């Protein structure tokens, strides 16, 4: 095996609550496998919302908004696996994670698809409803970025109401453990492939940017 492998977790919760507890559980599983695990709390990152410019539909360079998003994106690019974890708020994805996937996606990731072939994991935390919907949205986001999703049985959805309740959801935590184990298996497999073959591409990434040549922002062309 090469240098220590790493999983980066993106925590889309506004507080140090159940989602953070779940990621601490995930960290223990990863570290038991010898994988470095780092959690980035979006609540601690200065993050601007997308503005009205619309330039992201046409420009070939990164977003010009100056905030903490590029630093997080750089950590994602350097990692071997990435977990997107978010609580359910208002029957949907918590606003911090929603803002992040918009800003990171259209501002930085769409041009060269630097997350291609990285291993992805999805965790959603909910009181009762919409855990599956949030899990599905984040899954589609990972697929959009050409990441590799590994099957681990039931989705890693954890149910909790009050602080600390997530740690009482034994089935949910079991699914989180299985997710991290399967991510680690795939990361190690890909690492071994690179080491034995000397290839860094692993899987063909095809065209760099599927949006090139699409006229998506016709309003800017109008006088």
Curated annotation (Swiss-Prot):
A single GO BP: antibiotic biosynthetic process
Pfam families given in the database record: FMN_red
Enzyme Commission numbers on file: 1.3.8.16
Cofactor: [4Fe-4S] cluster
GO molecular function, one term: oxidoreductase activity, acting on the CH-CH group of donors
Annotated binding of [4Fe-4S] cluster, by residue: 50, 53, 56, 63
Cofactor notes: Binds 1 [4Fe-4S] cluster.
Catalytic activity: (2S)-2-amino-4-deoxychorismate + FMN = 3-(1-carboxyvinyloxy)anthranilate + FMNH2
Keywords linked to the UniProt accession: 4Fe-4S, Antibiotic biosynthesis, Flavoprotein, FMN, Iron, Iron-sulfur, Metal-binding, Oxidoreductase
Alphabetized InterPro entries for the sequence: Flavoprotein-like_sf, FMN_Rdtase-like_dom, ISF_SsuE-like
Family: Belongs to the SsuE family.
Its biological purpose: Converts 2-amino-4-deoxychorismate (ADIC) to 3-O-enolpyruvoylanthranilic acid (OPA).
Protein name: 2-amino-4-deoxychorismate dehydrogenase
Source organism: Streptomyces globisporus
């Amino acid at each position: 095996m090469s240098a220590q492998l790493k999983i980066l977790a993106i925590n889309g919760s506004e507080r140090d609550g159940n989602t953070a507890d779940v990621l601490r559980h995930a960290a223990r599983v990863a570290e038991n496998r010898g994988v470095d695990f780092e959690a980035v709390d979006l609540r601690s990152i200065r993050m601007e919302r997308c503005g009205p410019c619309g330039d992201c539909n046409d420009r070939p360079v990164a977003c010009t908004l100056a905030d903490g998003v590029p630093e997080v994106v750089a950590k994602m690019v350097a990692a071997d696996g990435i977990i997107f974890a978010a609580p359910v708020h208002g029957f949907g994805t918590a606003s911090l994670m929603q803002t992040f996937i918009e800003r990171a996606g259209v501002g930085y990731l769409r041009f060269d698809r630097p997350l291609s072939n990285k291993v992805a994991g999805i965790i959603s935390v909910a009181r009762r409803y919409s855990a599956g919907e949030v899990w599905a949205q984040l899954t589609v986001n990972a697929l959009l970025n050409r990441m590799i999703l590994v099957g681990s049985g039931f989705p890693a959805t954890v149910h909790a109401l009050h602080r600390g309740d997530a740690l009482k959801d034994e089935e949910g935590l079991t699914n989180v453990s299985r997710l991290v184990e399967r991510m680690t298996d795939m990361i190690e497999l890909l690492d071994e492939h690179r080491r034995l073959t000397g290839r860094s591409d692993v899987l063909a990434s095809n065209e760099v940017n599927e949006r090139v040549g699409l006229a998506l922002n016709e309003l800017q062309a109008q006088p």
